[in-house]
Amino acid sequence: MKILIITVAGTSSRFSESLGKDCLKCIYYKNNIKESLLYRMIYQNTDFDCYVIVGGFMYDELNQVIENDFSELKKKIILVKNSYFREYGSGYSLYLGLKAIINMEFSQVVFAEGDLYVDKESFERLCELKTNVITCNDEAILASKAVAFYYDVNYGIHYIYDVSHNVLEIREPFTGIFNSGQIWKFVSSDKLKESFFSLNEVEWQGTNLVFIQRYFERLKREEYTMIRFKKWINCNTISDFERI
């Protein structure tokens, strides 16, 4: 079984502010639903057996859109409600998404943050690969908005991010640094489950990078592939969305 998890629970505060009204950015469009980030992500590749969508902010509106505009995939979609989207970090949405499928038999899980637009060619390649995948993009690494990862001298992966968007700090020698593409692929169900159950309640309430770090630190360099997106847009504002 192939599973895609998309987390869209956040309040979209910067997007709503730029638009002048409350809006769940993953379902925003100007002319039709096919322009929305959620539609674009799901229809990048419809070969998944299951789509897990974790919502929170404007959950009823999300549910209605799925009922009305994703009816042909409705049997494949699991919609999960995150009631703590204001109190907890992004890790809790990932926790709920993984919890929904943790007892299933799966061969691969792709996890994507729901505010992204990426090029179809790169995403399809990610889906076709039989290995674990981390992703990066070509944007400048700025503390004000970037999630970065670097390789230490032994090619171990380390993710770095400042929730206050002030500074990024690396306190050890490193061999490379990249701007994260915020989409990952997991092909080891055993390591995924080990990583899932190894985190405590407080850790899950932080960022989703805690789980990502826990999973990929269990892998050797030859056990994963890195894909660089040819086009990658993190749609924080309406101006970002209009770049698509």
List each language-model region with its residue ranges.
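Conserved beta-loop-beta/alpha segment of the NTase-like Rossmann-fold superfamily
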Residues: 74-153
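Residues at the starts of beta-strands that form the adenosine-phosphate
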Residues: 3, 49-52, 76, 108, ...
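Active-site glycine-centered loops adjacent to acidic/histidine catalytic or metal-binding residues
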Residues: 10, 115, 237
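Acidic donor-binding segment of Leloir-type glycosyltransferases
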Residues: 57-78
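N-terminal glycine-rich phosphate-binding loop and ensuing alpha1 helix
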Residues: 1-62
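Conserved alpha/beta core of the MobA/IspD/sugar-nucleotide pyrophosphorylase nucleotidyltransferase superfamily
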Residues: 4, 174-244
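Alpha-helical elements of Rossmann-like donor-binding domains used by nucleotide-donor carbohydrate transfer enzymes
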Residues: 40, 61, 95-96, 125, ...
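Conserved core of the sugar-phosphate nucleotidyltransferase
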Residues: 119-203
